[in-house]
């Protein structure tokens, strides 16, 4: 259903900047060039999927922040995709006058280090077998995994035979791949994907080359695990990351220093930002309520796990985390 959600944040103007294609975000450390002392630490980012080279633009914008970390999603719509970027219209020092409704490109709001944030990623997929090392590749095509033809590995991991065409193709269509760089972990000891994993679709198979094509350029040395969407895993993983966030900000077991600060003079109490002020949840338009068991079921899980905090979000055509789409 069409909807509008609004979160009002009590953040001083010197600690954030709204940016867009007509009011770009200055690289961290270059704020003085335009008379501002603002240094972006992280950013909430919206992007148009139709923009050429959008993954590269996301990575480049992340490099403009001191942390190199951005979060958000691709704008999605039943019809025309637009982005709203409303600055201070010249009435707030350092905020600029560029405001409007935009098509294409990137927009969002950057925050400095004084605006404390915690971010987590949930994939909602389970690996069907161990992670493999890509040992031969050509663009989007995985030619070999662990020095075996990639198609042979796919058949073994999914327990299928492509000669049995219809059941095999149905299972391949329900399968995705989780990708990581060589130095990043792929699967945790508990069996879930690590936060660094990027989940991508399988876009084709090449029996002639015994290869598998995926929706991302791959390189030799990267790690790949075949995976499938799993409703129970998605619910458990969503609950887990919310619990991690709550524990990071409101630990059940306090350290001696924190306990002492809470009982001491209010001037040395923990910074208010350590208490959860609000949350933004970016979900995948490809799964939504039905995947979690009913309308709004996904948001109800987040609400229960985080507690009674202001909560907004949106369904994205693709999620943005770290420097990745």
Predicted regions and their residues:
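Small-residue-enriched flexible segments
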Residues: 1-279, 284-291, 304, 314-325
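Amphipathic alpha-helical segments in well-structured domains
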Residues: 58, 295-299
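Catalytic phosphate/nucleotide-handling subdomain of diverse soluble enzymes
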Residues: 298-312
